[in-house]
Amino acid sequence: MGNTFNRTYSKRRSTFNFDLTKDFDMDAFKNVIKLFSSNMPSKQFEFPYQIDILDWSDRQLRKDIFYGTMPRDPADHWARFNNQTLSPVLVCFTHCFDPEPYIASLEIGMALMALTYLLQSNGFLTSFCQCIEDPNSLGSRITGKDNTTLRVILPVGQHAYPEGTPSIPNPFGEPIQKKCNILQLDTPN
């Protein structure tokens, strides 16, 4: 266990530019999700969060998430979109009790850590997106329930564009520039 954790920890990365032209192994992803969901603990077995997994079946929702998650760049300007959300799959965490219990954000953090570790140790690339412009509206659209707040998105893929790729295709038709980040370690698989 220690060697596996140390190896994964030392090779951790955040992927911003997922390559959608290569196949995504949905069966392997589902196996990781099954393993995660059957082993994740919760305080008093309440699970104060809900997890929704989005593929590309609802392109309009994915486009709204793409334009509704706008990170800041180093110069303190808002970007118009978030490349991370173009991943093959988005794992969306929302709280599911009203009012939100104090423990919800802690449990979401623990679940994110566990899921990220499982995914990366099984060959998946991940990222992290919490810069959500209207978390209430997106949360309600994702879950189909009113008064739901989207807390965090975990983009998941298996392939990234190689370093030095000047731009990536936008599935919505507009050209986008590749996000550059010195700490980014996008690696093609």
Predicted regions, residues:
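Short proline/glycine-enriched turn/loop segments at secondary-structure junctions
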Residues: 139-146, 167
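C-terminal helix-cap and adjacent tail motif
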Residues: 4-15, 20, 24, 149-189
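Short, charged/polar surface micro-motifs in flexible loops or helix N-caps
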Residues: 56-61, 97-99, 160
